[in-house]
Amino acid sequence: MSSCALTGHRELQRDFSEDLLEKQLEDLIENGTDTFYCGMAVGFDLVCAKILLRCKERYPLKLIACIPHPNQSERFSAYWKKEYDECVAKADERVIVSKEYTDGCMQKRNRYMVDHADFVFAYLFSETGGTAATVRYAKQKGKPIRYYGQPYMPFYN
């Protein structure tokens, strides 16, 4: 069995498909991934969390909510706050990586996920920002990376 760190942008592009994402996550599960580290941010993270919670009805998997600080959702819209609260409540584990917000707490959360996972699944369309930095960090650590939108292929390391 293996573990996966999820990373992706808050903004979802027009061509983003939850159906495709669900198919890709199911492919990961069916090929041995049973633990997912999720940063619980607006956008890609919470969409993944919702899908994985649905998948738990059919597959034995574990969702670990990796929270950068206790007040992560305080500036979320009402819609995303509701999604966040539901997903965090249903997660198998909750890890809060910083006691309070600091300039580096998001990066610390992202590095925690990469350090604890066997590989990374990324929704990346920009070379800047937290997602790009997380992918670069994963590459530095020698972690395999799969990307949203690419067909499933076994890793060859």
Predicted regions and their residues:
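Acidic/glycine-enriched connector segments
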Residues: 1-157
